């Protein structure tokens, strides 16, 4: 109905401290169910079985078609602070973990982000600047401040060396938290200047969000200068021109 030739399912890899991740014993069942769907609908649509692996996770990623590498936590002195659970939890992390210095938190976030591929063996990089989830209108920090920019661009440069593409993620827009995708339009300009590759992702947690505002963000990417987007297939990446 939406015109997709393929679809990727991905759940969060098990984490001891979080109830919203898969339980370890559920992973084989999840993989089997997605494989069954792939077989059932193979003549209509290609279905891949993926996983979103946080940089702090130590779980294996074996048995998946692809891995999304992401950062949801910043670690400081043995404590883990979630950046995307709620504004209150973010504020707690800024206060308790970083002495009220939000730029120290964003710097640590991007230090971990820089290692997300080496930590997760990611197929692609998910929501690169997730730390901005609750920062609409510069609520907590200025994304053009040099302290933020230097940390973000350092991470971007490190990840570009891995050759992995960056997703343009519309999930925050769908949830009404952001007016721009992840990465922000400014960071997408930086990515284009560095000849990075992109793909589109709606980070869907429900059917209604599938492909959310793809046409709009694809047009924005084209205006920035991107000529194509990548699409992940069973046999690897395919590149499609932005029209």
Question: Which residues fall in each region the model found?
Answer:
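A structural signal for well-ordered alpha-helical scaffolds and beta->alpha junctions
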Residues: 27, 31, 106-110, 152, ...
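Acidic (Asp/Glu)-rich catalytic clusters
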Residues: 35-42, 59-68, 117-121, 157-163, ...
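A generic local structural motif
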Residues: 55-56, 111-112, 185
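Charged catalytic cores and adjacent phosphate/nucleic-acid-binding surfaces used
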Residues: 133, 138-243
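Short N-terminal signal/transit or membrane-insertion segments
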Residues: 1-16, 57-60, 64, 121-137, ...
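Structural preference for beta-strand elements that scaffold enzyme active sites
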Residues: 1-3, 46-48, 65-68, 123-125, ...
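A metal-dependent hydrolase metal-coordination microenvironment
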Residues: 1-88, 99, 103-107, 209
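Divalent metal-binding pocket/active-site signature
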Residues: 4, 9, 69-157, 165-175
């Amino acid at each position: 109905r939406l015109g997709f030739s393929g679809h990727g399912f991905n759940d969060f890899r098990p984490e001891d401290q979080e109830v919203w991740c898969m339980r370890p014993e559920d992973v084989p069942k999840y993989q089997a169910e997605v494989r069954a769907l792939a077989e059932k609908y193979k003549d209509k649509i290609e279905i891949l079985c993926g996983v979103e692996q946080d940089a702090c996770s130590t779980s294996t990623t074996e048995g998946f078609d692809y891995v999304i590498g992401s950062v949801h936590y910043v670690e400081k002195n043995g404590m883990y602070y979630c950046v995307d659970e709620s504004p209150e939890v973010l504020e707690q992390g800024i206060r308790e973990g970083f002495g009220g210095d939000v730029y120290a938190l964003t710097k640590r976030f991007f230090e971990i982000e820089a290692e997300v591929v080496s930590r997760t063996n990611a197929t692609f990089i998910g929501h690169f600047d997730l730390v901005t989830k609750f920062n609409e209108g510069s609520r907590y920090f200025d994304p053009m401040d040099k302290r933020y920019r230097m940390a973000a661009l350092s991470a971007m440069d490190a990840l570009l060396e891995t050759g992995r593409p960056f997703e343009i993620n519309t999930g925050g827009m769908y949830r009404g938290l952001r007016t721009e995708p992840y990465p922000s339009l400014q960071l997408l300009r930086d990515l284009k200047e560095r000849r990075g590759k992109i793909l589109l992702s709606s980070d869907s947690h429900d059917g209604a969000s599938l492909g959310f505002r793809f046409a709009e963000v694809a047009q924005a990417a084209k205006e920035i200068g991107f000529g194509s987007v990548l699409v992940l297939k069973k046999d690897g990446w395919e590149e499609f021109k932005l029209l």
